[in-house]
Amino acid sequence: MIGKMLTKVFGSKNDRVLKQIRPLVTRINDLESTIKPLGDAALVAKTVEFKERIAKGESLKDLLPESFAVMREAASRVLGERHYDVQLVGGIILHKGRIAEMKTGEGKTLTSTLPVYLNGLSGKGVHVVTVNDYLAARDAEWMGQVYDFLGMSWDKIIHGMDDVERRAAYAADITYGTNNEFGFDYLRDNMKFELDDFCQRGFNFAIVDEVDSILIDEARTPLIISGPAEMSTELYDNINSIMYNFKVEEHYTVDEKARTVSLTDDGIGLGEELLDLENLCDPSSIEQLHHLNQALKAHVLFQRDVDYIVNDGQVVIVDEFTGRTMEGRRYSDGLHQALEAKENVKVEQENQTLAAITFQNYFRMYDKLAGMTGTADTEAAEFKKIYDLDVVLMPTNQPMVRDDYADVIFKNEDAKYRAVVREIAEMHEKGRPVLVGTISIDVSEKIADMLTKAKVPHEVLNAKQHAREAEIITAAGQVGRVTIATNMAGRGTDIKLGEGVRELGGLHIVATSRHESRRIDNQLRGRAGRQGDPGSSRFYLSLEDDLLRIFGSGRVSGIMDKLGMEEDEPIEHGMISRAIENAQRKVEGHNFDIRKHLLEYDDVMNKQREIVYQQRYEVLAGADVSAEIQEMVNDIVRNLASEFSDERLDSLDWDWAGCLERLQEAFSVQPEWSEETRTDIKFEELRDLIAGVVAQKYREQEEENGADTQRQLEKILLLQVVDGLWKDHLLSMDYLKEGIGLRGYGQKNPLNEYKREAFQLFGHLMETVKSQVVSSLMRVRVVHENDVDRMEEERRRRHEEEMQRIQALVPAGNADEEHQQPAHVDKIGRNTPCPCGSGKKYKKCCGKLS
């Protein structure tokens, strides 16, 4: 109550932010009279002037009014589009590193040019991030005309480009691309062996278009580069063949809210019987239990044409939020293989992680981050907590006149769909275009069949018809057009009204259910009523919808029964609307908790990744790593001396045989120490004794190999050992995370346990790196002078081939999966035939050189 009164007196926080910006907008407008009379050459010269002023120490903040005025005039001359005042406000919000919520049709793409131009003047690079290649290419080429005019370099990153093209694109002042391409390029760069091969040049400023889709919806999806694990796929088919025996409630239970399925005791017993196992819960049977659980998920939780489609003998994931297919993406942890077995298509090998990062941690690397979307306010708390981004609601240039009608609720789905088709037919008869929003492919096809029977012409846009997406959406505002779109497919493309449609009432939105998130519902509504156009929307619901069935109250159904309502009789009631909104809030809160929880775990992994990648970068950047090698040697020597000296005993009784054996393992040396040498010595003396032997061995080796060759060998071995052990460490971390939840049963905090054990694993990784690098270095021999060059040349050639193969396999477009099923990109397996054509296994051929 008091909060509402204060808001009335002082205005909301959003109002205060906008009020602070207005004087800046006035200054930009005042400069128009100075900028407008300039000739083209004088306007272009402003870019050079701005760069010189920055070089002399002037800040971007000081340049903002004049640079915005220059960009506005340039856009007007080149594109014939002048930035509105609200777009100036949006540009200022973005420059300040905030999220601008701008309604559909308000010109987000044009707005972004203002901060992009200003920040591009610094020469440090600006990344404009979009959700798919089509939008990246479209926006880059469209706005690139203005950047060209002003003398700014720009480029785009799209799927299929090679490293030379990517390096050139990142070197530009302004780079457009998708979140996937930026993220995968970061991972690929950190798998390379030369700094000159890196594509990216830093993380200065990023503007994320459709920021809610990328930073919220896809936050649960790590980007992963992976290689095939060395295991058979036969077990997937064997497990799949017995799944028909398992019955719900008797053998397994389903929690639809948590989206989990669990075996009962009877289910475990049935599994033991069918798989001929004595104890399915025994550690020796852990693989069979894991496969059985994944097969249950595949059969019970994942639906064909909802969660995935089968296309050309492949299981292809369907994005939950956009309805787009994600070619090349695979669920992890054996789930994708279980789906392949379920659908009776070829079961591919499982994957092992080689490099991974979440979008949350990737985008937090930028010095400044900003975003644009039509729907962010419902997730403002999450943006602030996770990314420290404030959301500012932008006023529309024209008043919003769309009519959002009350929800209509039916007892069952059949009645709901009949009502939907009736409304579409009525609107079509009037000539009004209709956009029908569905949550899955099967619903879109059901509505399409019903419309065909009703003789209403229509277009269907879902994962099966994604190729014509932009074309279908662009035409959706024409007279009498009916378009069925799954999960906001076509987002990013404006629906412009055809001739005469405004007079008919504009675009009408019909939604066949509510999404779990209010934000997705608002996105669908926002397709109508752009830039002051008329329009309307209505949501059709039934008590059988998943949202109401799983999260809603059973009281709603009871009320409808007591009222004696007929099947085709709808109800509109405030209590039901509140129940729906409460259900959505529950789901949003639940999903936020999941993302926050996952980030807490990923932050542990992220710290380790930063350390390894930074050390790797320093090795690549330095010509000489001998100081690091010497430090490793000193640590190993110190540990050896500590292990084999025991000052409670006479030094002659120490384990000298064990010490000599370990010296042979670690340094490939076998000193012959006399009894006199071993008499009455202490820890420090043993340490110096070992250090002397090792130093002598190292000097001899350096003399034999030559100093330059030795430095080259040190770098090669250090990088190869780090990369190999990092891959194994990622696998260990995957196993740790998978089982850590069980610690809760032992009254321990799983997150604290994960942090503790992850720290131990990382410590072990660092020690193993030291021992393997030093051991390998002490054993290597150069027979011919050009051996190292030949080894380096072969390694570089093979590495380039692998990176090209990874590049070719990285999928284009959008990406999103459940949080436990990341995206993968394949790499050569150790046991697969070597790509050089020798006929040998990869690990026995070119793999040895890596």
UniProtKB/Swiss-Prot annotation:
Alphabetized SMART domains for the sequence: SecA_DEAD, SecA_PP_bind
Name assigned to this protein: Protein translocase subunit SecA
Organism of origin: Desulfotalea psychrophila (strain LSv54 / DSM 12343)
Name of the encoding gene: secA
Family: Belongs to the SecA family.
Record-listed E.C. numbers: 7.4.2.8
Entry-linked SUPFAM superfamilies: Helical scaffold and wing domains of SecA, P-loop containing nucleoside triphosphate hydrolases, Pre-protein crosslinking domain of SecA
Cited NCBIfam families: PRK09200.1 (NF006630), PRK12904.1 (NF009538), secA (TIGR00963)
Any GO CC annotation of this UniProt entry: plasma membrane
Entry keyword set: ATP-binding, Cell inner membrane, Cell membrane, Cytoplasm, Membrane, Metal-binding, Nucleotide-binding, Protein transport, Translocase, Translocation, Transport, Zinc
Binding site for Zn(2+): C834, C836, C845, C846
Cofactor: record remark: May bind 1 zinc ion per subunit.
Entry-linked HAMAP family: SecA
